[in-house]
């Protein structure tokens, strides 16, 4: 099944991601600034990961980490290459834009990810509440817990020669769902409600709007079916 996604405008702008999805790979890139490299960023990541997964010989000057799976290493190296391309290209002479990048790969009941910035990634199993895999504290939430401020990610790709990447793996079961939430806040209901059956995008949207009707967000729901 395909990724289902939607945006909610609220009162303050939040960029929508450029999306690539195929049967096993999901790539999201959001541009913060006037830059125009989000699609190229996605294309470069897809090209590298597809080649690596297809046993095509790919070379990189970045270290292969033995503490990670092969799949997580592919995603991590693709992210490092993407960061290098933006830092030495669009941002070579001055900072133009930073990018949030999320790469998720599913293969043989193993879910792998590499990420700089958001969105939050959560996994849901039938009858259980959502469990976070990655959660990000927005800078605006650090500055003020009560006033609605413009969103600003803690981590962005392309602003330095290196970048902080969150990556890992988890085993998933048939009928699990992956929830991606580009937002400053997460609804309390996400962690307390456990409706029977598959979770719908409409239900998550309702939870988010009820608690923070003025805060913009982007939501994605990806069924984890091989």
Positions of PLM-derived features:
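Conserved, helical-rich catalytic subdomain that frames metal- and/or nucleotide-binding sites
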Residues: 71-72, 131-180
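Short, surface-exposed beta-strand-loop junctions and turns on beta-sheet-rich folds
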Residues: 118-121, 128-131, 139, 186-187
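C-terminal catalytic subdomain
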Residues: 2-4, 162-226
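N-terminal entry segment of metal-dependent catalytic domains or homologous docking segments
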Residues: 1-58, 92-106, 110-111, 119-124, ...
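Helix-loop-helix
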Residues: 47-90, 192-214
């Amino acid at each position: 099944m395909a990724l289902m996604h939607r945006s909610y405008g609220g009162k303050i702008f939040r960029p929508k991601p450029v999306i690539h999805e195929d049967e096993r790979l999901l790539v999201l890139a959001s541009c913060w600034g006037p830059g125009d490299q989000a699609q190229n960023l996605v294309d470069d990541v897809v090209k590298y990961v597809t080649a690596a997964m297809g046993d095509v010989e790919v070379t990189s000057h970045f270290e292969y980490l033995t503490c990670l799976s092969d799949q997580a290493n592919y995603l991590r190296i693709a992210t490092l290459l993407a960061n290098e391309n933006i830092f030495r290209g669009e941002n070579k002479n001055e900072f133009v834009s930073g990018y949030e990048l999320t790469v998720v790969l599913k293969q043989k009941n193993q879910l792998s990810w590499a990420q700089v910035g958001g969105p939050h990634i959560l996994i849901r199993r039938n009858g259980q509440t959502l469990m976070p895999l990655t959660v990000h504290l927005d800078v605006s939430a650090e500055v003020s817990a009560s006033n609605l401020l413009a969103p600003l990610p803690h981590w962005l790709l392309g602003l330095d020669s290196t970048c902080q990447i969150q990556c890992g793996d988890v085993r998933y079961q048939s009928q699990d769902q992956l929830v991606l939430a580009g937002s400053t806040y997460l609804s309390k209901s996400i962690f307390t409600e456990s409706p029977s059956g598959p979770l719908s995008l409409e239900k998550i949207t309702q939870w988010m709007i009820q608690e923070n009707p003025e805060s913009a967000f982007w939501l994605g729901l990806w069924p984890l079916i091989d």
